[in-house]
Every structure is written in C-alpha cells, then in structure tokens.
C-alpha cells in the first residue's frame, strides 16, 4: 500500500467515525438492535448532545427502513406493567446537556420494517429538531 493510499484510508476512517451534528446538536454512538428475520419492528439508540445556549427538541424521525418511524418511550402503568408509547411531544435536549435514547427509555422505533435489521447493515435516519432542523445520520446495526 502506498503512503498516499494509506493517508487517504486513514482520513476516510476518521471522517466516517465522527459524530453527526447540525448547529448545536451532536449525535453520538448511534446503533440499531439486530432483529430476527420475521421481525416487523426494531429500535435505534444514541446519545443526543446540545452544545447550544437554548434547549432544543427532537420532534420527529424518518427513515426508509420502515413504513413508520417514531420516537417512543417506556412507562409503567397502574398495574406495574411496562408499556411502550409514542412521544408525541418529542424529547427535550437541554442547553449544554444531553439526552440518551437508550434501551428501557426513549428510543427510535421502526414499525413495518422494509427488511430485517441484520448485523453489519447500516440504516439511514433523519432526526428532526425544533431548532437545529434535520440531522441525517447512518445507524449501524449491531447485536450490542
């Protein structure tokens, strides 16, 4: 491998491993959970950071990976049963703070998958923020 090729490969590796950002919002460590071959839904998780001076809000999510993509959370009902529900109001990312989209909490929910989420695949996702606007990211599918 020539020195020029090595430098180019290194530069591309660094560029593709940088967090995605738009304005004050940065998205770090996104991943989707691998699904079974017959699964019709899946989920993605990531860390959202707001380096700005004002709160922002994640208000929507889109992807061609499923017929419907929403921001969901888990909550406990009166009988102590955990249920998933759509976060219609979105999720606030506080100024100078962060918000985790994580298992057992807020997360991106894919319903009506176009294809199974297979280990090693990548999913294109666009996050819509109230202030920062659209942030397009690539979400790797992992068995984490």
PLM region descriptions:
Residues 1-5:
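Positively charged n-region of N-terminal signal peptides that target proteins for export
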Residues 7-17:
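Bacterial N-terminal signal peptides
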Residues 23-144:
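Compact, glycine-rich, soluble single-domain proteins
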């Amino acid at each position: 491998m020539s020195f020029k090729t090595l430098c180019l490969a290194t530069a591309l590796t660094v560029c593709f491993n940088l967090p995605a950002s738009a304005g004050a919002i940065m998205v770090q460590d996104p991943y989707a959970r691998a699904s079974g071959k017959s699964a019709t839904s899946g989920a993605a998780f990531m860390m959202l950071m707001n380096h700005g001076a004002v709160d922002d809000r994640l208000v929507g999510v889109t992807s061609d990976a499923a017929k419907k993509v929403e921001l969901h959370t888990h909550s406990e009902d009166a009988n102590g049963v955990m249920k998933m529900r759509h976060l219609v109001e979105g999720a606030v990312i506080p100024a100078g703070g962060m918000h985790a989209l994580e298992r057992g909490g807020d997360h991106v929910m894919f319903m009506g998958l176009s294809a199974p989420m297979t280990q090693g695949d990548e999913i294109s996702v666009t996050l819509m923020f109230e202030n920062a606007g659209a942030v397009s990211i690539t979400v790797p599918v992992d068995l984490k």
